Amino acid sequence: MQAFLADNPVLQNILDMAAIIIPLSMLFAFCGICILTVSGEILGMRRRRSFYGKCAMQLSMLGQGLGWTLLVGGRVWLYFLEQDIPSGSILIMFHEISWMVLGLSVIFSCIYFLLWKTLAPYPGIHIGLGVICALQSVLALLLVLACLRTLAVVNLPLAEETTPLQVLMPVWGTEYATSLCYIPFLMLAMPAAFGCVWLLLRRQKDDFGRDHYNTVIPWCAAWARNAWAIVWLLLLAASVLELSPLLQGGTLETADAVTAGIRVLLWLIPVLLWFMAARSATPLRHKASLTVSLVLSCLFMLPFFMGLSSWAPLP
């Protein structure tokens, strides 16, 4: 297999990018989905409409699939990864702790989903359980990202006095600091992006009526649009900060400006597509645009990871 991939570098690059994009997209979607489901439950209670509660249950089911896939896939990945790390290394302990915390998040999410009907007469208790699940998921996300950061940086030529805290601490103006700014908004946008497509796929299985999907798909699309708009504004600000010194110094190349412009415009597309779906009276007809939005938002994981794994020593 390795010889085959060595003879096909394009395929090797595609697989390498997919190995970053797919797990990271699923991780953000899973770790943020409880925030979305709890919001749906609260909104359903306030508006006295069952649409949002049913949508929250559908999204919680999606969370089960994402969570267990991440947990099993992460265990397999760690098995092969740790074979190349000396036994007793602190990295192994860090990896195992991150995986166990992720496992706790999956278990809490499973309990939250399984007790949905049992705790239906006690919505406050169920919402409280969802809040605990959401907090646990946020902790799991931060630990896993810290683990990925450490794993990416540890093999770089670091100074001997570099500490783990320095590896994790951001430096203003670096790609790593910018990536950290994206995290809370990606955690809100990705579950909604997955949720829009998931609701389309569940249309036949969960026949709650056309009015249900005409209500909840625009709600998910609006959630994704708002969160992704902030991601895009952060990207725009980062691009301006990156190009301003070059422009002032007269060293800005046309290729750099074009690349930055394409990057900014590319990830504006999901905002526009979600905006149209959120405002549409017939959101079920937006299957293609919602799918394209999901794909583009997943592709953003690649530059995000590159920023997360970049290294700039503390001044």
What positions do the PLM features span?
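Final/C-terminal transmembrane alpha-helix of multipass membrane proteins
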Residues: L290-W311
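Membrane-interface transmembrane-helix boundary segments in multi-pass integral membrane proteins
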Residues: E175-S179, G249-L266, V292-S293, A312-P315
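Hydrophobic cores of alpha-helical transmembrane segments in multi-pass inner/ER membrane proteins
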Residues: S25-T37, M100-L115, C181-L199, R263-M276
